[in-house]
Structure formats: C-alpha cells, structure tokens
C-alpha cells in the first residue's frame, strides 16, 4: 500500500493539469446563460459598453466649461486651415525679404565674407546719420550771412527734425528688429534710431539729396554723385545687417514724403529770421 501511494503522488506531480496555470481546465463547466465562455465574453464586453454609453451621454450633454474655454481662445492660437490668398502672399514676401536680407548682410560681422571692407561701409552709412546732419546744419546756419542761405538752412533743419521724429515714432510703433541681432550704438540712441523699420538713414539720405538738388545750383557730375550717395547709403545699411530690403525701400519712400511736406509748408525769409532771432535770443529784429 505505501508503494501505491507514493506512485499515485508521483503521477499527480507529473500531471500537467495540476500546474497553477492550467487549474482552470480542471474546474467544471457552469451551466446557464449560454455557457461559461458566453458569460466571460459578456463580462469582458461590459466595461467597453459602459465606456461607450458614457461617451454618448457626454456627447449629448456637453460640459459648458469646455465650451467656454474653446470660445475664449484667441484667434492667434487657432490654426488657419484655409488662409486667404492675401495672407499667403504677405507671408511669402516677408519670407523672401528676410532670406535675401540675411544673405546680403555680407558686412554684418568682421568674420563675414566682406568683413575686410566693413569699416568703409560703416563710414559710408555714417554720412547718412541724423546727428552729423543736424549739427552741421546748425553750424552752417550760424556762419551764414545771406538771407537766402539762412532761409534754405532753416527749412533744411526743420526737414531734418521732421525726419528724425517721424522715423523714430514709426520705429517705436512697429518695433521690427533687423535681420542680424546687433545692439544699437551710442549715436543710434541719440538719433532714436533703435529699430529696423523704416530705415532712418535711407529716408534721410533721399530727403537731403532731393532738397539739395532742388535748392542748390550744382554741376551735372555733382548731381549724379548726390543721387548715387543716397542709394549707396541705403544699400550700406543692408550690407551691415542693420535693415531689411523692405526697410530701406520704405525709408526711400518716406524721404520723398518728407521733402514734399517741407516744400508744401516752406517757411518764408521773414519767418526764418524770426525763428533765428528767437533761437539766438536776439530780439531786435522782432521790433
């Protein structure tokens, strides 16, 4: 008998069905409801059915908070799936402007491709700065002895001040940065030429050249050089990486506008003499 018991125990140990992972096969089949397999399938489907019902209820009764959040989203955060032709054209032109301006900034740094001529380009750009022109006009006005010369210089000074104030105001409104990250210099802060749009040097160069061509008697070579100077001043700002191409183009247009405004409100000789007397604290011409 003990030998038979040891044999039966050995058989039970070697039986595969006695392992823990196969214990469910030894359980009897439960009757009713289409069998145990049907119940297990039914119980397996119940969570998914509940989730579907919950989703349907949430779809029928949307939460007002989510709707409020969606309504409160700004238009900047929304994706424009169907942008207008005007928007596509503007974005394309801006991308071309930025790309070409970056490539033309060959004198932006000393290590650039044209870094050897950077000092000459900076000197050319300095000739269109507002501070030298304003102080130079004041010095010439103090040394002028003729009424006609003083009349021209006073109107030129007013044109320069108008250009500086208008360009600085537009730059602070737009606040566009240049194609290359460069901090403005000391003279730029004095002339309030901090941002990129519009190009102050280009506007001033066009206005001054147009003014001098209209009110000074110059030879043909000098007139040609004056026009080339205005164009090269605008190009130099692009080569230095300070402005985009559109900044310079708008600066040229703004310079023509300033010249037209000065011609419309041209101050007479008597008015200029009055302003000179007020500025020099010489009140005798007023009486």
Curated annotation (Swiss-Prot):
GO cellular component: endoplasmic reticulum membrane; membrane; nuclear envelope
Membrane topology, Extracellular segments: 142-146, 237-247
Membrane topology: Multi-pass membrane protein
Superkingdom of origin organism: Eukaryota
Protein name from the UniProt record: Inactive phospholipid phosphatase 7
UniProt keyword list: Endoplasmic reticulum, Membrane, Nucleus, Transmembrane, Transmembrane helix
PANTHER family per the UniProt record, alphabetical: INACTIVE PHOSPHOLIPID PHOSPHATASE 7, SPHINGOSINE-1-PHOSPHATE PHOSPHOHYDROLASE
Family: Belongs to the PA-phosphatase related phosphoesterase family.
Role, per record: Plays a role as negative regulator of myoblast differentiation, in part through effects on MTOR signaling. Has no detectable enzymatic activity.
Compositional bias per record (Low complexity), positions renumbered to this chain: 49-65
Gene that specifies this protein: plpp7
InterPro entries in UniProt: P_Acid_Pase_2/haloperoxi_sf, P_Acid_Pase_2/haloperoxidase
